[in-house]
Structures are given as structure tokens and as C-alpha cells.
Amino acid sequence: MSDEYDAELDELLRRKALEQQRKALEEQQRKAELEAKKDAILRVILTPEARQRLANVKLVKPELAEAIENQLIALAQSGRIQAPITDEELKEILAQLTNQTRKDYKITIRERGWK
């Protein structure tokens, strides 16, 4: 009787593992399709130099690059920007965004009077 339960438990665990693998594979495929669509749109709205610059930004600050990609795609789809965006225009966009998100830190050192 214990062997039956063990076999049944093993079967349930195997099915659950297969289901999780299937879901992970589907999620990976969905992300790859989305990335391919984004890439295709960015090829249309960015010059090769601008795409290279964005790829360099993505290496250093992936979150910033992702935000810029999403904004550019949204602006292009709504017709608010003229394609293709040059490297110089992308530099201006990057400068504006980094100025908005930049945090300035101030360090103050006070003497404690230890002598």
C-alpha cells in the first residue's frame, strides 16, 4: 500500500515538474517574441548609430535603456516623433532623462572635537 502512495506521489511530482517546465518555456518564448517585436520597431525608428548607442546604454543601465525603448516605441506608435531618430537626437533624449533621474548627494563632514 505504501508503494502505491509512493508511486502516485512520484507521478504527481513528475507532472507538476513538467507543467512548471512547460510554463517556463512558454514564458521564455513570449519574452523572446516581445523582444523581437521591439527590436523590429526600434530598427525602423532609430538609425544604426542610435541603435548602437542604445545597446551600449543597455549594457551599463538596462533599466534606463528599457524605459527609453518603451517610450520611443510609444511615441512612434502615436505618431509624435519623426522616424528615424539620429544618434544626436538620442543623445539629447538621454541627457534629458538622466538630468531628470539624477540624484545629487551632499556629504557633510563635521568635526567631532576628538583630540
UniProtKB/Swiss-Prot annotation:
The keyword DNA-binding applies. InterPro entries: DNA_bind_arc, PDCD5-like, PDCD5-like_sf. It holds the Pfam family dsDNA_bind. One of its GO terms (cellular component) is cytosol. Disulfide bonds: none annotated. GO terms for molecular function: DNA binding. The keyword Lipoprotein does not apply. Keywords: DNA-binding. Belongs to the PDCD5 family. NCBIfam families: PRK04239.1. HAMAP family: dsDNA_bind. This is DNA-binding protein STK_13740.
